[in-house]
Amino acid sequence: ISIFLGEQLEDVVAQLVETGKADNLKEGGVLRTGVSTLPDFVKDATDRNRTSPFAFTGNKFEFRMVGSEDSIGSPNTTLNAIVAEAFCEAADRLEGAEDFDMAVHDLIKEYASKHQRIVFNGNGYSDEWVEEAERRGLPNIKSMVDAIPALNTEKAVALFEKFGVFTKAELDSRVEIEYETYAKEINIEAKA
């Protein structure tokens, strides 16, 4: 999975990683209509990348991975657990910091540097991204059924148990349910 930040936010992150601070804000520019009777418009610096599974669109992130017939509940539960872990880790470090502002600065720079490999503002459907993701060491899970085993890995179990979301037995059950649902849907489609 990659994340789309847009030119403006990507530039801020790049400044943080390279210099440790972000002093300049990239402007969106002007969208010229080419028609003398119409005004030119300010171009949004965040753009709209519709091929990204997780995109920043001005003032929010959009999560676009869930299929149209699927519930957002399970992915949201997972995202919330991941965010809770990140907040917990950040809070532990910041609460013990002697210089809070410097600790925030260092934490942002560290996170931006550590996770820079998931930022991709190009076409997420292209062969270029598949090659780039491989070069960056990112997994390329091509189907939902291939993603199911990630639900009950040691890392996933530890995350969900840490926050009291799911036990290992509950995650094992969810894996079984996902496989069963997939098999039923494939059988129905095969008979149609």
Residues of each region from the PLM?
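Acidic, glycine-enriched catalytic cores built around paired aspartates
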Residues: I1-A192
